[in-house]
Each structure stands twice: as C-alpha cells, then as structure tokens.
C-alpha cells in the first residue's frame, strides 16, 4: 500500500473541491483507508488517497498528463 494522487488513465490527477467528501468516498471505493482533497498542491486541487492498494494507479511524476 502507498499514498498518492489517484489519476485518470491519462495520468491526470482527479480534481476535487476542497473540504468536500468526494475524495474520501472515491479513495475508499478504490480500497484506500481514506482520502481528501489536497488543495493548492503541485497538481492543483487533487484527490490524495492514504493506504491505497498497489494495484490502483497513482500520479507518476515521470509522465506528463496527456488530455
């Protein structure tokens, strides 16, 4: 398990609204312990998951977001 930004298949972070419950819900659906909206982070407002299973893709800093 690890922590990280959940991403779309294009390696773009899933954006969110700070303090909304959406990220916690999305992260838990993917098997994480919890999650929250990381506001004003390096990738904008993105969903950060805690204790996410290794099989779930997270933001790869070595790859660009391809929209």
Curated annotation (Swiss-Prot):
Pfam families in the cross-refs: Toxin_3 (PF00537)
Keywords on record: Disulfide bond, Ion channel impairing toxin, Neurotoxin, Secreted, Toxin, Voltage-gated sodium channel impairing toxin
InterPro entries membership: LCN-type_CS_alpha_beta_dom, Scorpion_toxin-like, Scorpion_toxin-like_sf, Scorpion_toxinL, Scorpion_toxinL/defensin
SMART domains: Knot1
The organism's place on the tree of life at top rank: Eukaryota
Residues of the propeptide: 67
Keyword Secreted belongs to the record: yes
Subcellular locations according to the entry: Secreted
GO annotation, cellular component aspect: extracellular region
Biological process, per Gene Ontology: defense response
Classification via SUPFAM superfamilies: Scorpion toxin-like (SSF57095)
GO molecular function: sodium channel inhibitor activity; toxin activity
Principal subcellular localization: secreted
Domain named LCN-type CS-alpha/beta: residues: 2-66
Endpoints of the signal sequence: none
Tissue specificity of this protein: Expressed by the venom gland.
Gene3D superfamilies membership: Knottin, scorpion toxin-like
Disulphide bonds in the chain: 12-65, 16-37, 23-47, 27-49
Residue spans crossing the bilayer: none
Described purpose of this protein according to its UniProt entry: Alpha toxins bind voltage-independently at site-3 of sodium channels (Nav) and inhibit the inactivation of the activated channels, thereby blocking neuronal transmission.
Family: Belongs to the long (4 C-C) scorpion toxin superfamily. Sodium channel inhibitor family. Alpha subfamily.
Comment, domains: Has the structural arrangement of an alpha-helix connected to antiparallel beta-sheets by disulfide bonds (CS-alpha/beta).
Protein name from the UniProt record: Putative sodium channel alpha-toxin Acra7
Species of origin: Androctonus crassicauda
Organism ancestry: Eukaryota, Metazoa, Ecdysozoa, Arthropoda, Chelicerata
């Amino acid at each position: 398990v690890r922590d990280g930004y959940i991403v779309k298949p294009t390696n773009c972070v899933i954006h969110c609204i700070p303090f909304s419950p959406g990220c916690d819900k999305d992260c838990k659906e993917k098997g994480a312990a919890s999650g929250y909206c990381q506001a004003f982070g390096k990738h904008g407002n993105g969903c950060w998951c805690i204790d996410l299973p290794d099989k779930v893709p997270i933001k790869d800093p070595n790859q660009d977001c391809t929209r």
